[in-house]
Amino acid sequence: MTTETRSLYSQLPAIDRLLRDSSFLSLRDTYGHTRVVELLRQMLDEAREVIRGSQTLPAWCENWAQEVDARLTKEAQSALRPVINLTGTVLHTNLGRALQAEAAVEAVAQAMRSPVTLEYDLDDAGRGHRDRALAQLLCRITGAEDACIVNNNAAAVLLMLAATASGKEVVVSRGELVEIGGAFRIPDVMRQAGCTLHEVGTTNRTHANDYRQAVNENTALLMKVHTSNYSIQGFTKAIDESELVALGKELDVPVVTDLGSGSLVDLSQYGLPKEPMPQELIAAGVSLVSFSGDKLLGGPQAGIIVGKKEMIARLQSHPLKRALRADKMTLAALEATLRLYLHPEALSEKLPTLRLLTRSAEVIQIQAQRLQAPLAAHYGAEFAVQVMPCLSQIGSGSLPVDRLPSAALTFTPHDGRGSHLESLAARWRELPVPVIGRIYDGRLWLDLRCLEDEQRFLEMLLK
């Protein structure tokens, strides 16, 4: 060991000396003595490794307390950090999909703080059913006879098939054998549910007679799957639920539908593209309809199944139901969200998903122009900051070909180097509340459709 190396090792402080320093008192109070000591030992090992490798001390050796504070602060951050979603995708799966209404947030907090009547009947002091209150709400909204709630729509489809068609055939159009994120495929789900898939028709055209010819003594269901994350256009043919229900009645085979996104209101009244609604399919006579709680409905992640009482009873009594059931926080948030639908006049104001989807391009354009000047003054030396028209998308597999006119702030590096965009985007992801945009066509785009807290946004970006 050289004299220089020995000198470097001698500069490493003892842990007990560091702990006596006043700057460590607050760290020990905040994070605990055990964790602080554990980290200091780790840092000493790191410092010794640096000395061995490069004959120097790490830069942070000049202020151990500051480095410990920085590391423990970062470590204490939640894995689920709030972000500002300026990607242009409203229901962004990777960012948690639907924002919850304030009523839902309050309902969850109350359910977490106190025992609740999850499965307790106050009338007779007996055991209740956790789905009952929500089932009544869903029946009121959709016109169904009964309802069942599980933890997501994939679970809803699995339960629906396992409880009503295990060991039998399910007839589905070839053009509706969807795959959603995470390689969730209808054929795979059918196998897991113990069903045999019977494909009919072709990718682009399926006729009523295709279903008719497929039905046999082992057929349990005729199934429709809403292709919510893609669209087949051109020379196409598909039969709707009412026609399929008529055929099912003739052949004595029930019809079920996986609706996917599941809007409970006609979106066209808000100037948005129309999406099929569960109540329309129930009115058409479909026996079971499944849909998501955290997409267009605007609630928590949940799988909702509405339909005929006898069919729902089979789902409720199936062993998978207990494995897939929703917890009290999900049920509390979903109930509060569904109650908003009983007052449709105020829905676009109180339901964040609908509020964001219905923001007009003109309002967003004015917001962008208001923000452009201070951001251009701050970033103008390196980037051209402009207001540009753009198209938002709904996301989460909802209305895949439809776009919403919007406006964005774009940042274009004066030197044209893409690495500067990557660096800027990375810097914004390190903010206390990360700002998430997207890089496209030589620009960093911030679609402002989902920006509601301008002051917070500016405070962070102008630091």
UniProtKB/Swiss-Prot annotation:
EC number assigned by the record: 2.9.1.1
Modified positions (N6-(pyridoxal phosphate)lysine) in chain numbering: 295
Keywords: Cytoplasm, Protein biosynthesis, Pyridoxal phosphate, Selenium, Transferase
Pathways involved: Aminoacyl-tRNA biosynthesis; selenocysteinyl-tRNA(Sec) biosynthesis; selenocysteinyl-tRNA(Sec) from L-seryl-tRNA(Sec) (bacterial route): step 1/1
Coiled coil: none
Domain of life: Bacteria
Catalyses which reaction(s): L-seryl-tRNA(Sec) + selenophosphate + H(+) = L-selenocysteinyl-tRNA(Sec) + phosphate
One BP term from GO: conversion of seryl-tRNAsec to selenocys-tRNAsec
Cofactor: pyridoxal 5'-phosphate
GO cellular component: cytoplasm
Subunit structure, interactors included: Homodecamer; pentamer of dimers. Binds only one seryl-tRNA(Sec) per dimer.
Protein task: Converts seryl-tRNA(Sec) to selenocysteinyl-tRNA(Sec) required for selenoprotein biosynthesis.
Family: Belongs to the SelA family.
Protein name: L-seryl-tRNA(Sec) selenium transferase
Upper classification of the organism: Bacteria, Pseudomonadati, Pseudomonadota, Gammaproteobacteria, Enterobacterales
